[in-house]
A protein has these predicted regions:
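Active-site activation/catalytic loop segments of kinase-like enzymes and analogous catalytic loops
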Residues: 65, 226, 230-248
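Conserved kinase catalytic-core segment
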Residues: 93-109, 164-230
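Mobile late-domain/C-terminal helix-loop "cap" segments
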Residues: 243-304, 310
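A residue-level signal for conserved active-site and pocket-lining positions in enzyme catalytic cores
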Residues: 65, 108, 149, 200, ...
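Regulatory N- and C-terminal appendages and interdomain linkers associated
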Residues: 1-50, 216, 260, 284-314
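Conserved ATP-binding subdomain of kinase catalytic cores across diverse folds
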Residues: 42-162, 218, 266
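C-terminal regulatory or interaction extensions
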Residues: 143-144, 150, 225-233, 262-264
């Protein structure tokens, strides 16, 4: 079936990769841009950019892109650090990483979690990559103040795994202009990450930003990846400690952490119950995704196991 790379729904005859309305949401035009690079060319360009130290930080390869939509051109081109979009290609180490990240971001949307704009996009050789719109720049290119929790807790990047989620919650409480709402949203995002096998949400994967230029608030979720199904050898369930541990987590551990940062138990209970009722929709989204059948089955099994573990203690 010919499906949209943005919403996963079927395309009409004559449409290619995107519905016009989906392309407009992601790229500002009903005509999706070209990605004029093959995977091998992207690897070569990425190596060049890394040598000039203009790559974006993080373990997963990331490239900064600009949309050139003038003089009849409609292409995404690789730039230095401050492009409009961030692109993540396929990797040799972990298969289907772009597809996994994109569907996990879709699940976050179904869960009511605010995320950055995102989509899959096809390269010139037909392979798929993941693309997201930056939120630390305005449409005119002006910088929006944004700090991750390495910066906010004054830790160097190499210490991004040396902290706790309780520390993040207390830092949100200290700096956010919407501290109670953002603490709740942070805890819900953390529970979602556990349910979806994301054990790589370290200090740099949460941020505060100031879209109005004055007030710092929790940034939309980004870098949501089900690491557990692509790297089952890693038995840790979270990147940082929660209630003093990273694995064998229970619902009680989340409630204990929530209590420390002032979140009522009832708020979390209500949301978990709603998510469990919505699990068939989550699985339907995975079924519609671009994952292989094997990877879809792994995702279903992990969701079932994690939901069972949390709800049995309610």
């Amino acid at each position: 079936m010919n499906k949209c790379l943005y919403c996963y729904k079927p395309l009409s005859p004559g449409q290619h990769d995107f519905h016009p309305e989906c392309a407009k949401k992601m790229f500002g035009s009903p005509h999706a841009p070209e990605m004029p690079y093959s995977r091998s060319e992207m690897d070569s360009l990425a190596a060049q950019i890394i040598r000039t130290q203009t790559t974006l930080t993080g373990v997963q390869p990331k490239l900064s892109l600009n949309l050139n939509a003038h003089e009849g051109s409609n292409r995404l081109t690789i730039v230095g650090l401050w492009g409009e979009y961030i692109f993540k290609p396929q990797t040799e180490d972990f298969q289907q990483l772009p597809e996994i990240e994109d569907v996990t971001m879709h699940l976050a949307g179904l869960a009511g979690i605010r995320t950055v704009d995102h989509s899959l996009i096809r390269l010139a050789d037909g392979s798929l990559g993941y693309i997201t719109r930056r939120i630390d720049r305005t449409s005119s290119g002006e910088k929006i103040a944004m700090e991750d929790f390495c910066q906010l807790t004054e830790r160097p990047t190499e210490y991004k795994y040396r902290s706790s989620y309780e520390k993040i919650g207390k830092t949100i409480r200290q700096y956010s202009a919407l501290s109670q709402l953002d603490c709740v949203n942070f805890m819900l995002l953390l529970i979602f990450c556990f349910l979806t096998g994301n054990n790589d949400m370290h200090l740099k994967n949460f941020s505060l930003y100031s879209p109005d230029g004055r007030n710092a608030v929790l940034a939309p979720a980004y870098d949501l990846v089900n690491v557990s199904i692509i790297n089952p050898a890693d038995k840790e369930e979270l990147a940082l400690t929660l209630s003093g541990k990273k694995s064998n987590l229970s619902w009680h551990d989340f409630l204990s952490a929530a209590s420390l940062i002032g979140i009522p138990e009832k708020t979390l209970q209500k949301t978990l119950s709603r998510w469990q009722k919505g699990l068939p929709k989550w699985k339907a989204c995975i079924a519609d995704s671009f994952l292989s059948e094997e990877m879809k089955a792994r995702y279903y099994d992990l969701l079932d196991e994690r939901f069972t573990r949390l709800t049995k203690d309610q």
